[in-house]
Amino acid sequence: MKQYLTFTEEVRHALENNLPVVALETTIISHGMPYPQNIEMAKEVEQIIRDNGAVPATIGIMDGKIKIGLTDSELEEFATNKNVAKVSRRDFAYILASGKIGATTVAATMIAAEMAGIHMFATGGIGGVHREGEITWDVSADLTELAQTDVAVVCAGAKSILDIGRTLEYLETQGVPVVGYRTDEFPSFFARKSGFGVDMRIDTPEEVGKMMNTKWDLGLKGGMIIANPVPESDALNHEEIEAVIQKALAEAKENNIAGKQVTPFMLDKVKKLTEGKSLATNIALVKHNAEVAAKIAVAYQKEANQGK
């Protein structure tokens, strides 16, 4: 397995010395945002993690290798190359074996992070059960990954375009703890509210770090969700975004958009219908998640190092 992994010097040094590391995905760069906002966001997020005492490890697949940490030129490649594949668990081996370039989703980033020994990951929002999922069976592989891979994910909830109620039901079935970070309500990506509660509320990085260590010390496989609402000043109104999503969903149906095309299509439509406000919110919530993830990574690593 190790023959597939390559590390930047910064990440290698951190892992060898038991320093806190935060994994980052590349799908948000290649498929989630337009250029140049995507590359600007990627670099800013990495710096936010450094400023909060941890080391960023942006993950992607290139030239038959799983890159744990990317150089500036590699980041640029993910931001501008139109042939970047979107990689989840099922595509992982194929993209790696064929030498193609692949951006990692939440699921694929978790797989690579665990291989590298990284247990903290910051993203925008997780995938989940799509609306009308009971008819289409369109359920993101992110959810099954969270059930089996030991990586905690800081996110602003599930993407608003999903069926949040069913997503939470599925996570409960899979035994994935959903922690509200300083919130009692599960956030819905662009909005702070969703109408659904979290399993438990935790207000400090230290308590989250302790829970992570305890979970894995017990041999309880799988990750956990740390739901961190978008800052109030950047949030969109829950009812307004819901109306926009209903409109975008109708268009997706008319155009027979399905499978892994749904999320990029919907995010693009929502961006147009909100006149770009959703993109600004998306960038703000990713930065906020990176800050919280770095603080928790520091607390988790301190706790883990004491137990060694």
Curated annotation (Swiss-Prot):
Keywords: Glycosidase, Hydrolase, Lyase, Manganese, Metal-binding
UniProt EC number: 4.2.1.70
Pfam families documented for this protein: Indigoidine_A (PF04227)
MF-aspect GO terms: hydrolase activity, acting on glycosyl bonds; metal ion binding; pseudouridylate synthase activity
GO biological process, one term: nucleobase catabolic process
Enzymatic class: lyase
Residues involved in substrate binding: K86, V106, S140, A141, D142
Family: Belongs to the pseudouridine-5'-phosphate glycosidase family.
Quaternary structure note: Homotrimer.
Name of this protein: Pseudouridine-5'-phosphate glycosidase
Origin organism lineage: Bacteria, Bacillati, Bacillota, Bacilli, Bacillales
